[in-house]
Design a protein with these regions (language model features):
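N-terminal active-site segment of His-dependent metallophosphoesterases
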Residues: 1-49, 53, 62-71
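Binuclear metal-dependent phosphoesterase catalytic core
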Residues: 6, 78-79, 105-107, 122, ...
Length: 159
């Protein structure tokens, strides 16, 4: 299973650039996880209408109904892998270590955003993934490949 993990789009509505990235890359994924800072209602509506398997969390910069209706963290299971996602906003210390504490030991992969910096590493037996910021000019996201019986794999995609 291939999951497109995105974060920190900071858009109220999808721009032509974002629509192109969506059509060329994200739409082909089996699922999409958005790790927060979507930012507005138009982006939430676009993602929900454009993909049948999208999961989103609220970030510190979300506005409107996105702030009111998106959870601060989610847990999903893909191909037997427990995957958690949150924005990763923390007042001190590392966002990766914060989300590890936030979710506890029962997750194989934890996705987060906030820092705008790609991160893929194993800490204490669990994988953490930050896809970077999917913004025009500094765009990146990650494909997370989950195959039963294999270690999770992630690759950064610059757009």
């Amino acid at each position: 299973m291939r999951v497109a993990v995105i974060s920190d789009t900071h858009l109220d509505e999808p721009t032509p650039w974002f629509r192109r990235v969506f059509d060329e890359h994200l739409a082909k994924a089996d699922a999409i996880i958005h790790c927060g800072d979507i930012s507005g209602d138009g982006m939430v509506r676009f993602l929900e209408a454009s993909h049948p398997n999208v999961h989103m969390v609220c970030g510190n910069m979300c506005t409107g109904s996105a702030r009111r209706h998106l959870a601060p963290r989610i847990a999903v299971t893909f191909e037997g892998f427990r995957v958690g996602a949150s924005h990763g906003t923390c007042s001190q210390g590392s966002s990766a270590e914060y989300v590890l504490r936030e979710f506890g030991p029962d997750f194989e992969v934890i996705c987060y955003g906030h820092t705008h910096v790609f991160d893929w590493r194993k800490i204490d037996g669990r994988w953490v993934l930050n896809p970077g910021a999917l913004q025009e000019g500094e765009g990146s996201f990650a494909y997370l490949d989950l195959v039963p019986g294999e270690e999770p794999k992630a690759v950064q995609v610059r757009v």
